[in-house]
Amino acid sequence: MQKNTPLILLAGLTPAQFMKRHWQKKPLLIRQAIPGMKPLIDRSTLLDMVESEEVESRHIVRKGEKWTLKKGPISRKSLPSLKTPDWTVLIQGVDLHNDAVHALLQQFRFVPDARLDDLMISYATEGGGVGPHFDSYDVFLLQAHGQRKWRIGRQKKFELQEGVPLKILKAFKPEAEFVLNPGDMLYLPPGYAHDGTAVGECMTYSIGFKVPRSAELASELLMGLSEEMTENAGTSLDVIYQDPSQTAAIKDAGIPAALQKFASQAVAKALKDPQILNCLLGETLTEPKPSVWFDPPDQDDLSAFAWPCGVRLDRRTKMLFDAKHIFVNGESFRAAGRDAKLLQKLANEKYLTAKEASGLSEAAAQLMKAWWEEGWWHPSDLIENGMT
């Protein structure tokens, strides 16, 4: 994405200007970020998704000061009447299930893919919402249908109400209020308190971002490192502890200092190689969510497959890269030269033309076929200068 091109999506700011002035710093209200905005998925189809085990959904109802929360899958018939006020359905990761929603999410790739998470859709009847709260991540709130009133404010106190199934602030003090119409969008940095209430029936699209926590990320990397070390067991990299200078024990149960040092050195050695850690990070960042399943080609497609062909990534595929590796759906592959350039292009643009794909080496072509058999990409009739 061109970082210095002004975007209507960002109120005429360039991506570079937005990131410098607003990202993780201050809110931005954008009127008509998407002119003529209409829902990309109809209400009936959206509400049907609450019954799917492949979709993360929540049903929230407010009755006065009382809140109830049900997590999906739930029966569509159990939802209140559309004329009943004060209820909301939240559908997470709709971009994984709908091409149009997935295409909309791609407009926010001025933020690195490693940080872009998903698009959640909130459907609400009159008065519906989830109460005043704050998120630990950046969020764009795009109004797709109807109106929603937003109250926002910086919080000094983040105490939550007790006995409530939602994380609702105990003492919310709004500083500003906006009513968003279809096409309007509000950006909020992490920790900025907000309370959205439906004005009549409405749909709001929330574009959210990943915020790795240091402890959680370290835990995942160390788990991967443990598997890496297990694979090295018994090889030349697996040094055996030796203590020819060990004296006779005076304190029988005392741990020898030399053994403590050996353990410390073993861990330090494992953490010392940045390539291993970078590889594990890429695998972690591209790991599909537990609910994600791919659709491998059927037998007829397998028989008809011909390479080279146009390549279009499946909307559920996560693909990143660094200087030496390509990461796809939790797996890592070394790539160099022309292969690296073409696979990086695939990660950036989500497609390759047949002519471009023909430039891959035989080894890379075999890898592409294996990915296709997993359902990670689909053959496509792409012309040389773009997509048909």
Predicted regions and their residues:
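Active-site region of the double-stranded beta-helix
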Residues: 1-21, 34-184, 192-240
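Long, charge-rich, low-complexity alpha-helical segments
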Residues: 10, 17, 25, 332-388
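Acidic, low-complexity/disordered tracts enriched in E/D and polar residues
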Residues: 267-346, 369, 380-388
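C-terminal amphipathic alpha-helical segment
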Residues: 222-301
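Proline-centered helix-kink/hinge sites
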Residues: 27, 189-190
